[in-house]
Amino acid sequence: MTTYLLKRLIIAAVTLVLASMVVFAVMEILPGDPARLMLGFNASTDQVELLRNQMGLNAPLVLRYLHWAGGLLSLDFGRSYTYSVPVIDLVRERVVVSLPLALIALALSTAIAIPVGLFSASRQGRAGDTLAMGAAQLGVAVPNFWFALMLIYLFAVWLRLVPAGGFPGWSAGIWPAVKSLLLPAVALAMPQAAILARVARSALIEVLNEDYIRTARAKGLPYRAVLWRHALRNAMIPVLTILGLQFAFLLAGTIIIENVFYLPGLGRLVFQAITQRDLIVVESVVMLLVAAVIAVNLLVDFSYAVVDPRLRGRQ
């Protein structure tokens, strides 16, 4: 088990290094000059070059990458070109919106998908199965930004149950803050819940055809007990894998959803930084998101042995 953990940690470290190179290279390839955007198009060439020197943009590419990557290791993300404040301060302000949003969406998608998958698998081929999987297919097909707009119209404009957008801050109280995150979380969660429900159904159907399930039924165990105690636990490996991947999709989806709902989170910060060519903000925030995704997937890998003890010996 120790060898397995060490191997996974090494793979995670290599992945982080490669991801940092890709992120840095992509941002360098994108058109636009941050110094020119900051000074305006009426600025002279000398003024632009002076600012580029001050910002370190004229240094060799390799040196700039090493300086940036070294700063990441020491949690020194540099200063924003646009806001003229440390990037870490911007992250602290925005992560208190994005992280709860992603966690609420993940909890919602799991709470919806697992019961739907159980229901559908236990009624394979029947009308309930067809209806549930049809709804799941629709959930996968509908774009989350369109679904978000429909939620705003229904619950904010028509029923007036929740705010249409914005975030009051946690200082306004837990319920007002959570209330403002409900619609965005539902918009993020539904497509992921649809995917997870289909995966859970497939895994459960495969497990329900195993010999030990038939043996448990033959011994007289109630079908519900067999389904929840035996089948679900053994079907959790693919479900956990998808959950780890979904966390990445949820973080990426916040870029769209936070702009639809006008939430001051990391997604909106990245979007604004891209339009303003604030390279240091984009690179640093994207790498933080990459690190978060890798950490979550490491936890998923480690949880396999907890869910299925048979894997401990193999690992």
Q: What are the functions of these language-model segments?
A:
Residues 36-39, 63, 78-81, 147-148, ...:
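Short, hydrophobic secondary-structure boundary micro-motifs
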Residues 22-29, 59, 70, 134-165, ...:
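Membrane-water interface segments at the C-terminal ends of transmembrane alpha-helices
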Residues 58-114:
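An internal, D/E-rich "acidic patch" concept
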Residues 35, 74, 147-148, 183, ...:
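Alpha-helical transmembrane segments and their lipid-water interface positions
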Residues 15-66, 159-180:
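Hydrophobic alpha-helical transmembrane segments of membrane transport/permease proteins
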Residues 26, 30, 38, 42-43, ...:
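Hydrophobic aliphatic residues
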Residues 2-4, 13-16, 89-130, 144, ...:
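Alpha-helical transmembrane segments of integral membrane proteins
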